[in-house]
A protein has these predicted regions:
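Sec/Tat signal peptide C-region and signal peptidase I cleavage site
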Residues: 15-20
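Structured, acidic catalytic/metal-binding patches in enzyme active sites
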Residues: 25-35, 41-204
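Sec-dependent N-terminal signal peptides
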Residues: 4-14
């Protein structure tokens, strides 16, 4: 069966040139039909898909799409609720209690730059003050992309684009991972102290 598989890449540099090879065709004498692998990046603007040579032919020649997740599963209320709970710090912990005074000041400086407000604002503190460093890292990355990445829209993604294409054409969509696995990898597999270090790397 012809398949389009989306592989997320952690390298922004892959998207600095339309000439970078992001689409691969897999074929061979023992395969009845080819499959395609596309390298994607969550923070790349969806408009970039038009710069990937061969994408229209690949989409028109596939019978199913396989992504990191089935995006429809991710949008279900129960999945959103699970994610929100996983992003919270353990009871009694706050970001302020985890960071030194100097680190907290540096974090506030970045927040002020990105949102024109910091943790001294009750609304900002209520939104960010009790989430894990990893969750805040993700939120800050989105805010940075909104501010600096031309054409970035957090409501659209490569995965969503390809999966919607498949569903419009009545093709199956497969997720490589479950929502629970994503939560485990993103928010539970990294110790809090290491999350803090990664957060401060982003801040600095």
């Amino acid at each position: 069966m012809k398949k389009l598989m989306l592989i997320s890449l952690a390298l922004v540099s892959m998207f600095t040139s339309a000439n970078a090879q992001l689409l691969y065709k897999i074929s061979g004498k023992d395969l009845k039909s080819p499959s395609y692998i596309v390298g994607t990046y969550h923070l790349a603007p969806v408009s970039f898909v038009n710069a990937i040579e061969g994408i229209p032919d690949a989409l028109n020649n596939t019978e199913q799409v396989c992504g990191e997740l089935d995006m429809e599963d991710m949008k279900k209320p129960e999945s959103v609720q699970k994610m929100a709970v996983a992003m919270l710090l353990p009871h009694g912990k706050t970001l302020k209690s985890m960071l030194t005074e100097e680190e907290y000041t540096r974090l506030n400086k970045l927040l002020k730059d990105l949102t024109s407000a910091d943790m001294s604002n009750p609304i900002v503190e209520a939104k960010f003050g009790n989430i894990t460093p990893q969750a805040l890292n993700t939120q800050l990355t989105l805010l940075m992309s909104l501010k600096h990445a031309r054409g970035f829209d957090p409501t659209q993604s490569f995965d969503d684009y390809f999966q919607k294409f498949a569903k419009r054409n009545h093709e199956p969509v497969i997720g490589l991972e479950t929502v629970d696995k994503q939560i485990e990898v993103l928010f539970k597999s990294i110790p809090l102290e290491r999350q803090k270090q990664l957060l401060m790397c982003l801040v600095d």
